[in-house]
Protein backbone atom coordinates (compact mmCIF):
# COMPACT_ATOMS: atom_id res chain seq x y z
CA UNK A 1 0.00 0.00 0.00
CA UNK A 2 1.09 3.57 -0.63
CA UNK A 3 1.27 6.01 2.27
CA UNK A 4 -2.02 7.57 1.20
CA UNK A 5 -3.67 4.14 0.96
CA UNK A 6 -2.46 3.39 4.50
CA UNK A 7 -4.02 6.65 5.71
CA UNK A 8 -7.32 5.76 4.05
CA UNK A 9 -7.26 2.28 5.59
CA UNK A 10 -6.71 3.50 9.16
CA UNK A 11 -9.33 6.21 8.66
CA UNK A 12 -11.90 3.59 7.68
CA UNK A 13 -10.89 1.42 10.65
CA UNK A 14 -11.33 4.38 13.02
CA UNK A 15 -14.98 4.75 12.01
CA UNK A 16 -15.67 1.60 14.04
CA UNK A 17 -14.82 3.62 17.18
CA UNK A 18 -17.44 6.26 16.32
CA UNK A 19 -20.38 4.23 17.57
CA UNK A 20 -22.55 7.12 18.71
CA UNK A 21 -22.65 10.27 20.79
CA UNK A 22 -20.44 13.23 19.96
CA UNK A 23 -17.10 12.64 18.26
CA UNK A 24 -13.99 14.82 18.46
CA UNK A 25 -12.25 15.18 15.12
CA UNK A 26 -8.61 16.09 14.56
CA UNK A 27 -6.80 18.04 11.87
CA UNK A 28 -4.54 17.01 9.00
CA UNK A 29 -4.39 14.72 5.99
CA UNK A 30 -5.18 11.50 7.87
CA UNK A 31 -7.97 13.17 9.85
CA UNK A 32 -9.41 14.39 6.53
CA UNK A 33 -9.67 10.78 5.35
CA UNK A 34 -11.46 9.98 8.62
CA UNK A 35 -13.96 12.78 7.99
CA UNK A 36 -14.67 11.42 4.53
CA UNK A 37 -15.24 7.93 5.95
CA UNK A 38 -17.33 9.27 8.85
CA UNK A 39 -19.67 10.94 6.36
CA UNK A 40 -20.86 7.51 5.25
CA UNK A 41 -22.14 6.67 8.77
CA UNK A 42 -22.99 10.17 10.02
CA UNK A 43 -26.51 9.10 10.94
CA UNK A 44 -25.32 7.08 13.91
CA UNK A 45 -23.57 9.97 15.71
CA UNK A 46 -25.11 13.02 17.39
CA UNK A 47 -22.50 15.42 16.04
CA UNK A 48 -18.85 16.40 16.18
CA UNK A 49 -16.45 18.85 17.77
CA UNK A 50 -13.74 20.12 15.41
CA UNK A 51 -10.14 20.84 16.40
CA UNK A 52 -9.68 23.53 13.75
CA UNK A 53 -11.57 25.81 11.39
CA UNK A 54 -10.37 23.68 8.46
CA UNK A 55 -11.77 20.52 10.04
CA UNK A 56 -15.06 22.25 10.82
CA UNK A 57 -15.38 23.33 7.19
CA UNK A 58 -14.72 19.81 5.90
CA UNK A 59 -17.21 18.27 8.33
CA UNK A 60 -19.89 20.79 7.35
CA UNK A 61 -19.24 20.15 3.66
CA UNK A 62 -20.30 16.55 4.30
CA UNK A 63 -23.42 17.65 6.17
CA UNK A 64 -22.00 16.54 9.53
CA UNK A 65 -23.11 18.70 12.46
CA UNK A 66 -20.32 20.63 14.21
CA UNK A 67 -20.96 21.63 17.82
CA UNK A 68 -19.31 24.13 20.16
CA UNK A 69 -17.24 22.29 22.78
CA UNK A 70 -18.68 24.50 25.52
CA UNK A 71 -22.20 23.33 24.67
CA UNK A 72 -21.48 19.63 25.13
CA UNK A 73 -20.20 17.34 27.87
CA UNK A 74 -17.51 14.69 27.67
CA UNK A 75 -16.90 13.37 24.16
CA UNK A 76 -17.06 9.64 23.44
CA UNK A 77 -13.91 9.51 21.35
CA UNK A 78 -11.33 11.77 19.71
CA UNK A 79 -9.80 10.63 16.42
CA UNK A 80 -6.67 12.33 15.09
CA UNK A 81 -3.36 11.68 13.40
CA UNK A 82 0.17 12.29 14.67
CA UNK A 83 3.46 13.54 13.30
CA UNK A 84 5.30 11.02 15.48
CA UNK A 85 4.15 8.40 18.00
CA UNK A 86 6.07 5.97 20.22
CA UNK A 87 5.17 2.48 21.40
CA UNK A 88 4.28 4.15 24.73
CA UNK A 89 1.60 6.23 22.92
CA UNK A 90 3.32 9.60 23.44
CA UNK A 91 3.08 11.83 20.38
CA UNK A 92 4.32 14.92 18.63
CA UNK A 93 1.43 16.73 16.97
CA UNK A 94 0.87 20.16 15.52
CA UNK A 95 2.48 19.97 12.10
CA UNK A 96 -0.74 21.51 10.81
CA UNK A 97 -0.70 24.17 13.52
CA UNK A 98 -3.87 23.08 15.36
CA UNK A 99 -2.11 21.66 18.44
CA UNK A 100 -3.87 23.77 21.09
CA UNK A 101 -7.40 22.97 19.99
CA UNK A 102 -6.38 19.35 19.38
CA UNK A 103 -5.07 19.11 22.93
CA UNK A 104 -8.25 20.68 24.33
CA UNK A 105 -10.57 18.32 22.45
CA UNK A 106 -8.42 15.32 23.40
CA UNK A 107 -8.61 16.33 27.07
CA UNK A 108 -12.41 16.36 26.85
CA UNK A 109 -12.65 12.87 25.34
CA UNK A 110 -13.08 9.49 27.01
CA UNK A 111 -10.87 7.79 24.42
CA UNK A 112 -8.14 9.01 22.06
CA UNK A 113 -7.72 6.98 18.87
CA UNK A 114 -4.58 7.87 16.92
CA UNK A 115 -4.56 7.02 13.21
CA UNK A 116 -1.22 6.97 11.39
CA UNK A 117 0.84 5.22 8.76
CA UNK A 118 3.87 3.25 9.92
CA UNK A 119 6.33 6.01 9.01
CA UNK A 120 5.06 7.90 12.08
CA UNK A 121 6.02 5.17 14.59
CA UNK A 122 9.37 6.02 16.22
CA UNK A 123 11.50 4.77 19.10
CA UNK A 124 12.22 8.27 20.43
CA UNK A 125 10.35 11.50 19.70
CA UNK A 126 12.11 14.52 18.28
CA UNK A 127 13.19 13.98 14.69
CA UNK A 128 10.03 15.88 13.71
CA UNK A 129 10.39 19.49 14.99
CA UNK A 130 8.25 20.15 18.06
CA UNK A 131 5.61 22.85 17.45
CA UNK A 132 5.06 25.36 20.26
CA UNK A 133 2.16 27.84 20.09
CA UNK A 134 3.21 31.21 21.46
CA UNK A 135 1.55 34.56 22.23
CA UNK A 136 3.12 36.85 19.57
CA UNK A 137 4.63 39.42 21.96
CA UNK A 138 6.42 36.62 23.85
CA UNK A 139 8.03 35.05 20.78
CA UNK A 140 11.61 36.15 21.47
CA UNK A 141 11.42 35.38 25.19
CA UNK A 142 10.04 31.90 24.57
CA UNK A 143 12.66 31.24 21.89
CA UNK A 144 15.46 32.08 24.34
CA UNK A 145 13.97 29.75 26.96
CA UNK A 146 13.64 26.94 24.42
CA UNK A 147 17.33 27.33 23.54
CA UNK A 148 18.11 26.81 27.25
CA UNK A 149 16.25 23.50 27.01
CA UNK A 150 18.55 22.44 24.18
CA UNK A 151 16.31 23.21 21.23
CA UNK A 152 16.72 25.31 18.10
CA UNK A 153 13.43 27.21 17.64
CA UNK A 154 12.43 28.59 14.26
CA UNK A 155 9.43 30.80 13.60
CA UNK A 156 6.91 29.23 11.23
CA UNK A 157 6.95 32.10 8.75
CA UNK A 158 3.65 33.49 7.50
CA UNK A 159 1.54 31.25 9.74
CA UNK A 160 -1.04 32.31 12.32
CA UNK A 161 -3.02 29.79 14.35
CA UNK A 162 -6.81 29.75 14.59
CA UNK A 163 -6.26 31.39 17.99
CA UNK A 164 -4.27 34.30 16.53
CA UNK A 165 -0.88 33.13 17.76
CA UNK A 166 2.44 32.11 16.19
CA UNK A 167 4.24 28.76 16.06
CA UNK A 168 7.86 28.10 16.95
CA UNK A 169 9.07 24.79 15.50
CA UNK A 170 11.79 23.47 17.80
CA UNK A 171 14.51 21.36 16.20
CA UNK A 172 17.11 19.05 17.79
CA UNK A 173 15.38 18.51 21.11
CA UNK A 174 16.38 15.43 23.08
CA UNK A 175 12.99 14.07 24.15
CA UNK A 176 13.94 11.28 26.53
CA UNK A 177 11.19 12.11 29.03
CA UNK A 178 8.28 13.55 27.03
CA UNK A 179 5.99 14.02 30.05
CA UNK A 180 8.55 16.17 31.89
CA UNK A 181 9.45 18.16 28.79
CA UNK A 182 5.80 18.80 27.95
CA UNK A 183 5.33 20.23 31.44
CA UNK A 184 8.55 22.27 31.36
CA UNK A 185 7.76 23.95 28.04
CA UNK A 186 4.20 24.73 29.08
CA UNK A 187 5.54 26.54 32.16
CA UNK A 188 7.41 29.08 30.02
CA UNK A 189 5.55 32.39 30.21
CA UNK A 190 4.01 33.15 26.83
CA UNK A 191 3.59 29.54 25.75
CA UNK A 192 0.00 28.54 25.02
CA UNK A 193 0.88 24.86 24.69
CA UNK A 194 3.30 22.58 22.88
CA UNK A 195 2.88 19.65 20.53
CA UNK A 196 3.93 16.95 22.98
CA UNK A 197 0.93 14.76 23.76
CA UNK A 198 2.46 12.67 26.54
CA UNK A 199 0.50 13.56 29.67
CA UNK A 200 -2.62 12.75 27.65
CA UNK A 201 -1.36 10.30 25.06
CA UNK A 202 -3.33 8.03 22.78
CA UNK A 203 -5.35 5.09 24.11
CA UNK A 204 -5.50 3.26 20.79
CA UNK A 205 -3.14 3.36 17.81
CA UNK A 206 -4.43 2.24 14.43
CA UNK A 207 -1.27 1.86 12.36
CA UNK A 208 -1.34 1.53 8.59
CA UNK A 209 1.25 -0.93 7.28
CA UNK A 210 2.01 -2.58 3.94
CA UNK A 211 0.09 -5.65 5.13
CA UNK A 212 -2.93 -3.83 6.57
CA UNK A 213 -4.06 -2.03 9.71
CA UNK A 214 -2.52 -3.05 13.03
CA UNK A 215 -4.24 -2.15 16.31
CA UNK A 216 -2.31 -1.30 19.48
CA UNK A 217 -3.94 -0.45 22.81
CA UNK A 218 -2.66 0.72 26.17
From Swiss-Prot:
GO biological process entries: D-ribose metabolic process; pentose-phosphate shunt, non-oxidative branch
EC number: 5.3.1.6
Entries under InterPro entries matching the protein: NagB/RpiA_transferase-like, Ribose5P_isomerase_typA_subgr, Ribose5P_isomerase_type_A
Family listed: Belongs to the ribose 5-phosphate isomerase family.
Gene Ontology CC, one term: cytosol
UniProt-recorded name of the protein: Ribose-5-phosphate isomerase A
Highest taxon, organism lineage: Bacteria
GO molecular function: ribose-5-phosphate isomerase activity
Active site: 102
Assigned keywords, A-Z: Isomerase
Pfam family membership, one: Rib_5-P_isom_A
Pathways involved: Carbohydrate degradation; pentose phosphate pathway; D-ribose 5-phosphate from D-ribulose 5-phosphate (non-oxidative stage): step 1/1
Subunit structure of this chain's protein: Homodimer.
Function: Catalyzes the reversible conversion of ribose-5-phosphate to ribulose 5-phosphate.
Chemical reaction(s) catalysed: aldehydo-D-ribose 5-phosphate = D-ribulose 5-phosphate
Binding locations of substrate: 27-30, 80-83, 93-96, 120
